[in-house]
Amino acid sequence: MDERIVKFLKKMHLASVCAIDDEGQPYAFSAFYAFDELNFCLLLASCDESSHVKFLKNSKLVAGTVALDTKIVGKIEGVQFQGVMREASANEREIYFKRFFYAKAMDPKIWSISLEKVKFTSNTLGFGKK
């Protein structure tokens, strides 16, 4: 995998993700994530009662973005992704809690998004460079 993508995903912590709702429409949500570099997954916490988790019965396919929050055009960087969301393994849970140790007290369910397609854009390389 492109080392720039790995470095960027390790540095960031907030993803915008889109699932498919009961009417087949896109449903967006934001989540803090930990990056599992070995398995190339984003790990996030969410409860079974959340709308986006309920929508996984329709399709486990998701898409989303991770972007640097900046107003300076020359510093814009981001990842666009497509993947599959499923319940995280015990090892993945540990990776999440290593990054967000304070969340362990709430004992949330952890989910894994395997990154199947990824595109990285960085204006630091020149405007609109992929």
How does the language model describe each region?
Residues 12-48, 63-66:
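Short beta-strand segments
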